[in-house]
Amino acid sequence: SDDWVNKEAYVQILKTLYELLRGPQTVDLLISNFVYEKQGATRKKIMQYRKCLPKDRIFGWEEVKHMPKGKYLLMHSMIYRTKLLHECNLELPKHTFYVDNLFAFEPLPYVKNLYYLDVNFYRYFIGRDDQSVNEKVMIKRIDQQIRVNKLMVDAYINCKSTNKQLKAYMFSYLDIITTISSIMLIRANTEESLQKKKELLEYIRTENKQVYRKLRHSLFGRVMNLPGRSGRKM
């Protein structure tokens, strides 16, 4: 991997985890910032959550503010309590790319207490042509993206939590992933890929009509309903 972590932020995270372990409350998820280290770029994009999450204290989902599209929790910003991952029986598909989305999604209903440390910890290197998030590579591996997408649909449908903020965040994340899957299938621009897009939508509609209708009125729906060649080029 070309990724790395910032030493000073790492020390702060270890110190915070140590203090939290000694405290009276159990923290299920520690969140920090990560930085996109793009090859050839002079300016770096920092994924931070200062306007969305309380800082330097334990909080619950009810205090999580709306995250705009493009801002969501990725594996690079999340440290789960190990026992929680065992409790939720998280099992990632083997020999499959893009499972980091499942790691950042499936355990969330089990997370009750969160903590946000505003440090730029993880450095996520992007921009290489052979990376899994490169468009051409994603199109080549689209079946794996679809598999992960369907598992996220299942996880959202099976989520028993009644917490509105949690469900809203999970839907927003699912919306983004479904939009990405559909855009990649359209960009592939083959009969087979367009058929796979239809099959993905049919899967969602069959599993849960309410989720399907909600997606049709979200970012996914707006992108998929762009008129004429504009929509197809997306």
State what each model feature region is.
Residues 1-144, 161:
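Nucleotide-sugar donor-binding/catalytic module of glycosyltransferases
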Residues 171-184:
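Amphipathic alpha-helical repeat scaffolds of TPR domains
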